[in-house]
Amino acid sequence: MAYQPPGKDNGAQSPNYNDSGHRLEDLPHGATYEEEASTGLLSHQQGGPFGGPFDDPHQRGTSPVRPTSGYSLTETYAPDAGFHDPYSTTGSVYSGNSAENPAAAFGVPGRVASPYARSETSSTEAWRQRQAPGGGGGGGLRRYATRKVKLVQGSVLSVDYPVPSAIQNAIQAKYRNDLEGGSEEFTHMRYTAATCDPNDFTLHNGYNLRPAMYNRHTELLIAITYYNEDKTLTARTLHGVMQNIRDIVNLKKSEFWNKGGPAWQKIVVALVFDGIDPCDKDTLDVLATIGIYQDGVMKRDVDGKETVAHIFEYTTQLSVTPNQQLIRPTDDGPTTLPPVQMMFCLKQKNSKKINSHRWLFNAFGRILNPEVCILLDAGTKPGQKSLLALWEGFYNDKDLGGACGEIHAMLGKGWKNLINPLVAAQNFEYKISNILDKPLESSFGYVSVLPGAFSAYRFRAIMGRPLEQYFHGDHTLSKQLGKKGIEGMNIFKKNMFLAEDRILCFELVAKAGSKWHLSYIKASKGETDVPEGVAEFISQRRRWLNGSFAAGLYSLMHFGRMYKSGHNIIRMFFLHIQMLYNVFNTILTWFSLASYWLTTTVIMDLVGTPSESNGNKGFPFGKSATPIINTIVKYVYLGLLLLQFILALGNRPKGSRFSYLTSFVVFGIIQIYVVVDALYLVVRAFTNSDAIDFVTDQGVGEFLKSFFSSSGAGIIIIALAATFGLYFVASFMYLDPWHMFTSFPAYMFVQSSYINVLNVYAFSNWHDVSWGTKGSDKADALPSATTTKEDGGKEAVIEEIDKPQADIDSQFEATVKRALTPYVPPVEKDEKSLDDSYKSFRTRLVTLWIFSNAFLAVCITSDGMDKFGFTNTATDRTSRFFQALLWSNAAVALVRFIGACWFLGKTGLMCCFARR
């Protein structure tokens, strides 16, 4: 229903939204998230006086015709605004590479070619040019009028900028007409240049945030941390968050959300971007489209004091889907997005995720004082009502300090990503963790890790020591903390902070005088993308494995601090049980390399070389061939394991993709071979009573003794039942068994590589703690802010450009065009760097040297080589080898002696005939 301005006759002609053009609207009732791709926005040329999304539907049917402006939208408000467009086409879809004029899709006159077009400059270079004062326009630089802005307390630059008319008009009338005392919440974006450390971002120092300025209680602070994700991944997370906020606002019978003001005013979304340099500039266009960012307003410094973070604030009802579809409210139906209070913090320099969390908790958290903080990584899509489920966990349990939901792998449409065995294996790993591990730890009250990609904390629970210990890993505090900071840490502590979320979990549960516990909330689900390539997978797991191992040891060594907490005796009893469980798991992890090798060899020996008494043949190649095959498999296994150390100690995974891929495949084949042998053992045990030397005719005691004998067959049967059987039973109990059929085989194929490749690489690179930052050369494109004094030198002011609304609107068109251009993933180059080439040659050289020597040693000394046609025994071969070696050394020594004698004789003879 179109909004009618006050005093307007309701019988007047309403804007026409029923055309087939670019409509900014939410999904139709009943539509699913995956169906958004069918909602075209750039499909056809606009028609009618209000055919474009940026035409103001709240203006009268006609408006005075202004002088022609290359970027003004107001001409399209006049129904007879004709013009000649040399690029005019009908019914075509704009693509970033076509020659058609994209302005036609918006009903805008033809204009001068922009120097910032994507075809002429890269998105990064075009972004740099747009940061110049007045440089956002497409027709070249021009002079604008200026206004004087006072600095808060003489040092804090905080300015309100008008948002484009299209964004203002997208806000529903019931919100725009209900402004609080002339609030500029929906009409202006607020920009603050923070020139301080996050700890100094306080009201006392002149900094403030809009929700606090409006005296609103913040119940839920939703934080999205970002590094360099593309606009599709960012939109997936942001649109999912806005849909979840809509779920909360639409609650009808809530005892909390419907009291004390609108529900949307109790929720704040904060996006924290880790540096201008790594940031994807197309993502900034998406944020500008919904109103939370504008080009050309950021300041590099204020009076020479460098800006640390650029903070934008706006309340919007717009959203962009991962398919680059722009969604806006059309009515008061349940699918309409409510207003969402947003903050966008763009850090000037890349200073790591832990510093982003310091901005979130120490800067924004202390001003907003939220009850619950939800942490998301860009790329994680929260499921329907997932954020509500997380919040309800805190609302219904006053002692809950932290919680996490179920994270599952993004499988794509029709689960097509499961074709990749690596994705399927990770899907199974995530599922089993959510079915077996997380519920167990939640029952104890201490979840060892709440994943930073999808977790929540009660803000007052983590205040104090938990956050203090957590932020010791922030390198920007190294000088301030001294020996307690990064510079004073040993390599063990630095690795510990690779899994800093584990540190926060332990500190929260062990907080002195408190009884906070952690929980897993299954009803809350989040979807995340997982590595699809071997190199990316190895690099990711290095940080996870090293960080979790160090943090696990930290929690065990500091378990005594639990006695200072306020937990009751029952909770402490279960925490002690969990500690013993963790100790046992740590020991198993430490010896996993040898355990896997021994398991593999024992199973192959049991099946391939059965005892003489039971009369079984070797499986699967017969009694004579199977031992030979098994011997080859063992040597290949050991050789590949040795290769992992060579690769891990000298190469980057991206520089050795083929070697690592080969290792995964060969280890997978060996694993399948061993699994087939193990299944054969089980089948033989239950089909032939004499097959594996079980005693079945002398009572239960003798049967159990033979079952658990050193032959190992009974133990293997129990192990198979306790793993495979347990997986199936637990999955069906949780009514989520599909991964057992779609992903379990792939997991079995990759499982041995988890131990033999990932663990070896992680421990071999224990020294790599990935600290350090990258400078931001992109910040050089930002202008500086210099103050002048007024009122006799009492007031510090700066001069700021005051753009006309028409120019703001026209520049916004170009922004939306860039934001809604279909995303084309960049082609990743697999070319090796020069350093990678040198390292690869070194690896091949060392590998050839080691394996050729090992092969010689095995051929000479191994008794097993008799099976390959060697007629003599290992003792005879060793004796003959030493004879050959001694004769060879003697021959070399003789040649060297002959050479020395020849040189001596020649030199003496030449002395007699040399000319003086």
Swiss-Prot record:
For this protein, what is the EC number? Answer: 2.4.1.16
Q: List the GO molecular function terms.
A: chitin synthase activity
* Recorded topology in the membrane: Multi-pass membrane protein
The regions listed as transmembrane in this protein's record are 572-594, 628-648, 663-683, 715-735, 743-763, 845-865, 884-904
Q: Name one Pfam family in it.
A: Chitin_synth_1
Positions bearing carbohydrate: 18, 546
- Region ranges (Disordered): 1-84, 114-141
Q: Describe the inactivation phenotype.
A: Exhibits hyperbranching and a lower level of conidiation. Leads to sensitivity to the chitin-binding reagent Calcofluor white (CFW).
CDD domains linked to this entry:
Chitin_synth_C
| Polar residues bias locations | 60-75
By sequence similarity, the record places it as follows: Belongs to the chitin synthase family. Class III subfamily.
The protein's name? Chitin synthase B
Species this chain originates from: Aspergillus oryzae (strain ATCC 42149 / RIB 40) (Yellow koji mold)
